[in-house]
Amino acid sequence: SIYKTKSLLHGLSQVRDRTFYFFWKGDEIPLFEYYNRPNQNMCEMIRSVPSDPADPMNVLTSNKVPSQDDHYYKFILEEICGGITHKEFVASLEPGRSVNPQLYIEKHSDYTKVADWLRKNGNPKAADKALRNAEKIAGGGNLMRRTSEIPSDYTGAFVGHLPMRVTHPDEDRYLTYREAMEFMKLPRDFNIISPKKNLNHICQNVPLTTAADMATNIKRYLEGTCEMIRDDYLIQDNKSKKLVMTNRSSSLEEFLK
C-alpha cells in the first residue's frame, strides 16, 4: 500500500509532500488514520528553542546578517518599507507562507529599481546581477531565488538553502543548528557530528511527528485494531482523504457492506 501525505497536515510548519510504501503479509491491507492537525506557527516554533550557551548546536548556520548582507532584503526594508527593522517587517506580514525577498520585490517593485539603488549605494556588481534578473523576468525566464526566507506561519520544504537562509523572527540573524533541527522535530538532546559539514543531514530525515504517525498506525495493525481492506494494492491519500483500490474492491461502499 501507499500512504500519501504532507508534513503540514501532521502539525509541522513546513509544506513537504511525503509518500510511504508498505508491504503487508496476506491479502488484506490496513486502513490508516487521516491527519489534519493545526500546524505549529513557524515563528513560535523558532522562539521556543532554548538558547543555551553550553549547547554545541547553539551556533549559527550562517554568520551573515540578513538586513545587511542580503541586498534584496535590505532594499525591501529601506526602500519599499521606508526604513523599518527586520523585527518590524516580520510583525507586518500577513498570516501564511514565509516570504522570499525576491518574490516580494517582484510583487511590490522590480529589479531595475533594485539595480539603481544598488549602483547608487556603490555596489555595481550586485546591480548588474539585478538587471540580469530583470531581463530574465521580462523574457519569461525563471530565477534561482536563494535569498533569505522570512518566517511567517509556515515555509516550504525545509531542504536545500533554507537551513542557512531562514531568519529568526525577532533577531536580525539566521538560524542556529538547534533551531534548524527543530523544523524536523529532532530531539533537543541530539547533536549532529560536524554540523557545518553535515548540515544537510537535518533535511534528509522524515520529521519526527510524521514518522511517529506512521509508526502508530503500524502498531495498530500489529495489535489488530485497524480496519482492513481486502485488496492487492491500495493508495490512501491523506491530502484528499480518498482511497484508490484495485481489483478486489470496486468501491469503499462495497467494502463497508
Q: Could you say what each language-model-derived stretch is?
A:
Residues 86-257:
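C-terminal target-recognition/interaction regions appended to catalytic cores
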